[in-house]
């Protein structure tokens, strides 16, 4: 996710240069006419999923087999940045050091935002699966997607906090590594999981966990992460000492110390950080001595943490997901950690596990960011100030590159700026 800019983008490289001779003053460009609207108050979220590839049951690197996503997807794709492309369904796809990664667009944080993000992710997964089905028929090989990881991203706007050494995104990530792992374990992990990570990514916080082949549990995990992270972001300090105020409400296992994240800077609550592997233990056994002097089960700890943040989780959750989170924490709905082993659905994503349209658009409309991006990816013209602009590319997730039809000049507009023109785009896109 790219940080939303509060000011319109400057003139892009490659635009027409001003002639040397005098000429009448030009009409201001759309992005120069007025400042972009203020970023949405709650920020944005996004989700990513990584998959390893099995070719005829053997693990392979996707870049070695397919070279580029453009050799899988038959429809034209808008280039995003680097080696990533936008799928017609709105997400981005790219190869990342031996895995295929699919990322959702930015989705503004609001009620039901995690359900929107989960829906977007699974729609893109199933689209890619269908394209791989066609590739199989053409090339005579079997291709399976094996779930590897899921990343839950929540934006962090530095301008929302006073400049303070105790309120950096790095300290926020470390603090969250002491809060998030146990409830995320119950919702997203399996018997072969090895850890839960939290990484500071400049303008966002990223929670990393195993891929979850159950869309409902994945959305529940995203909802819980949004509710907890947005609440903790409002704390007066991100120092670990703040946890001492809530030793019973926010139980931490005694002796727990996170380790550096394996892939990028950040922290991981790895199984080796605990006296016993929590991913293999019975989640209802009171095995864990906490810093508050109690002995609790994994489910009890996860339930207390969830209860503490329940008002914020409820604020951003849809009703179905809220009931599911509560049911898992109370033991009324199963956790994947209660199974003997990792389910086989992990190794055949898009076939053994699919998206059942849990949230149709009539029930949960697309977010405004999704609608803007959808128009852009389809190349639908936008008319502003009697000028027609055609989207031709993206700069990260936050900006759309347009070509003005009259003179083919290049213009870069932020998604926040384009929100002011969404109604015209919805009604007059061509």
What does each model-identified segment do?
Residues 139, 159-165, 236-239:
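Inter-helical turn/loop segments and adjacent helix faces that build the functional surface
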Residues 5, 10-11, 16-137, 146-148, ...:
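Terminal catalytic/cofactor-binding subdomain
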Residues 57, 157-160:
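Short regulatory "switch" loops immediately downstream of catalytic or recognition motifs
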Residues 142-158:
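Histidine-centered divalent-metal-coordination microenvironment in nucleic-acid enzymes
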Residues 166-184:
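Acidic, His- and aromatic-enriched active-site or binding-groove loops in soluble protein domains
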